Amino acid sequence: MSPPVPERLSVVDEIKQTKPFPTKSAEAYVGLLRTADESKRHLGDLLEPAGVTLQQYNVLRILRGAGEDGLPTLTVAERMIERTPGVTRLIDRMETKGWVERRRCTEDRRRVWCKITKKGLDLLEGLDRPIEAVDAVFDAALEPDELERLIEYLDRVRAEMRASQTVAGGW
């Protein structure tokens, strides 16, 4: 027997919108923001027992993917999902916990390289299985071809937002 299908609410019903959105774009944007918030809360709930924040998890994943050499701090900041001006302080806290280590670049003393430690790798390994539950949500909600289209649509929206910022000099 298949598990029950969760009740699907439109964003209009979910936020108890009493007036129609002025445009479909506005409705889609609110839906995207609500989905992003729900996703962040879901992931945060999975990470909380391990004492890891979303941003810390993101840094650990970036550094694990970088391999043994690690990455410059600024590169880590550029690759983060949720960009933060406080990446140095974030990495300070992670270094205190023993999850990452830093070293100055010998060629350019202004550059600082970050590398994930064994403790950080072990932490991530313990989180890999629970995080698969996040993927399972997408797999349950969408067919593979729908996921491909969603990825394409999101890429297009982000590209348009970047182009709009460039043309308008920011929002």
Question: Could you tell me what each predicted segment is?
Answer:
Residues 33, 37, 41-83, 166-171:
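N-terminal helix-turn-helix DNA-binding core of bacterial DNA-binding proteins
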Residues 92-152:
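Charged, amphipathic alpha-helical coiled-coil/dimerization segments
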Residues 1-21, 145-171:
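C-terminal regulatory/oligomerization modules of transcriptional regulators
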Residues 21, 52-54, 116, 142:
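Alpha-helical hairpin
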Residues 1-50:
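N-terminal leader segment of winged-helix/HTH proteins
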Residues 39, 80, 123-139, 157-168:
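Alpha-helical linker/hinge and terminal dimerization helices associated
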